[in-house]
Amino acid sequence: MTDNSKTRVVVGMSGGVDSSVTALLLKEQGYDVIGVFMKNWDDTDEFGVCTATEDYKDVAAVADQIDIPYYSVNFEKEYWDRVFEYFLAEYRAGRTPNPDVMCNKEIKFKAFLDYAMTLGADYVATGHYAQVVRDEDGIVHMLRGADNNKDQTYFLSQLSQEQLQKAMFPLGHLQKSEVREIAERAGLATAKKKDSTGICFIGEKNFKEFLSQYLPAQKGRMMTVDGRDMGEHNGLMYYTIGQRGGMGIGGQKGGDNAPWFVVGKDLSKNILYVGQGFHHESLMSTSLDASTIHFTRDMPEEFEMECTAKFRYRQPDSKVTVKVKGDKSEVIFAEPQRAITPGQAVVFYDGQECLGGGIIDQAYKDGKVCQYI
């Protein structure tokens, strides 16, 4: 039997059930476990209540229960500089960013990993639903989590081979229901705690109100693609491609009773384009350009491959051809895709393995630019 006692694993503990069970499983497997709570955002509300304080209490309770040392580290500055500034810049450019992808790349597996090394860590572990497998050459491959509904490789797609070499995902082979059962059997303080959802720094707050605190909204015209004026929009940053509703035009008909969707944006003219029907032709595209292309292991500077891809979280895979040149790529779809959204991640898969991905810049339909930005 392997003696894990000389292997130190520093666990990122959020105060939730997933990271609590992560620490418990590693402790049961004999590792030298240390828990660390990351404070990435000052989320004190108008009543002076800080949810991070409550979460840290839960971390402390679980750490005491399973008998591991624990610490708190403040990454508010790093988070602001590396994640939040990026988030604002993308919205300013009329795009729809995915801050979780950047948080994993820059905070959980960079700032936190660096901090863990100062504690003598051999590995860091998180409660992500993903799996890492080392091949005979020592290369780490990242595989989807066993729970299809919870698989989080989409959000981990920008991790490097160096980061994956130091990563452990003890929940990767489990179903979410099994994780809850383990927590309840062990009587963990977080066993019945509700899962957090949404963007961490927004929490339960109204998204529109939150964004308006940092970016001034500029109202403009809302038009159909054939030029019909549909009234005023509240600011392009509040709308995302493919969004249904929220435009205040539900009572207006355009020849049929189909619902209205956001089908495009023109940032230079501050126009929001809307159209009727889930499969409106302006929402469909046949290829995209992506940048910040990154793979989880070494790949040639220039190559072409066939694989599958996701263009948003929890979306079924789609067959694609990827043409890579440096950190940019063209992704050609086997079937037309709906609502490809600039700023979101495109993530590549070979069967169960997550190969990496990039950030969507522009969508095309039969070679013509989609009027998304």
From Swiss-Prot:
Alphabetically ordered keywords of this record: ATP-binding, Cytoplasm, Disulfide bond, Nucleotide-binding, RNA-binding, Transferase, tRNA processing, tRNA-binding
Residues that coordinate or bind ATP: G12, M13, S14, G15, G16, V17, D18, S19, M38, G127
UniProt-annotated site: Interaction with tRNA, residues: H128, Q344
GO process annotations (BP): tRNA wobble position uridine thiolation
Region (Interaction with tRNA) location: 150-152, 312-313
Active site: C103, C200
One Gene Ontology molecular-function label: ATP binding
Enzymatic reactions: S-sulfanyl-L-cysteinyl-[protein] + uridine(34) in tRNA + AH2 + ATP = 2-thiouridine(34) in tRNA + L-cysteinyl-[protein] + A + AMP + diphosphate + H(+)
GO CC annotation: cytoplasm
Enzyme Commission no: 2.8.1.13
Location of the protein in the cell: Cytoplasm
Enzyme class: transferase
Location of region: Interaction with target base in tRNA: 98-100
Keyword Kinase in annotation: no
Annotated S-S bridges: C103-C200
Keyword Signal carried by entry: no
Domain of life: Bacteria
Membership in a protein family: Belongs to the MnmA/TRMU family.
Cross-referenced HAMAP family: tRNA_thiouridyl_MnmA
Role according to the record: Catalyzes the 2-thiolation of uridine at the wobble position (U34) of tRNA, leading to the formation of s(2)U34.
Protein name: tRNA-specific 2-thiouridylase MnmA
Originating organism: Streptococcus thermophilus (strain ATCC BAA-491 / LMD-9)
